[in-house]
Amino acid sequence: MRRRRAERRQIPPDPVYGDVLVAKLINKVMWDGKKTIAQKIVYGAFDIIKEKMKKDPLEVFRQAVENVKPVLEVRPRRVGGATYQVPIEVQEPRRTSLAIRWIVEAARAKKGRPMKEKLAEEIMAAYNNTGTAIKKKEDTHRMAEANRAFAHYRW
């Protein structure tokens, strides 16, 4: 057991928008520590969003993340030789990180176009409550709803 709870690291805000959420997105997009490339991708995606939607890309991104955030998820719990999928509420920091992760994964899964275009498309889709990331959230909620009978196994 730990002596005390591990502290959450503070992520410095990104240089262009001065926003922690955008910094988290950049860190999720980043591969092999290549942050400059990740920043170009994210800011390029934001430019595309600004161009296509004629709205502040930061507000669009914030709303997209808000739309993708899951409320419930299932966690496996072993009880007497059987493993049950127990629905539990998702804590706020995990909600945000899951939402960003799902948006980036959905963008990466698309094929044949530059990443900034795919990311912009996925953020706009999430803003409009459509797209792969929203589908992932709905699937997670459906799983939790289906396993509602095991909710009393929560810990």
Curated annotation (Swiss-Prot):
InterPro entries: Ribosomal_uS7, Ribosomal_uS7_bac/org-type, Ribosomal_uS7_CS, Ribosomal_uS7_dom, Ribosomal_uS7_dom_sf
One Pfam family hit: Ribosomal_S7
Keyword entries, A-Z: Ribonucleoprotein, Ribosomal protein, RNA-binding, rRNA-binding, tRNA-binding
MF term (GO), any: structural constituent of ribosome
Keyword Isomerase tagged: no
Family the entry assigns: Belongs to the universal ribosomal protein uS7 family.
Function of the protein: One of the primary rRNA binding proteins, it binds directly to 16S rRNA where it nucleates assembly of the head domain of the 30S subunit. Is located at the subunit interface close to the decoding center, probably blocks exit of the E-site tRNA.
Full protein name: Small ribosomal subunit protein uS7
Record lineage: Bacteria, Thermotogati, Thermotogota, Thermotogae, Thermotogales
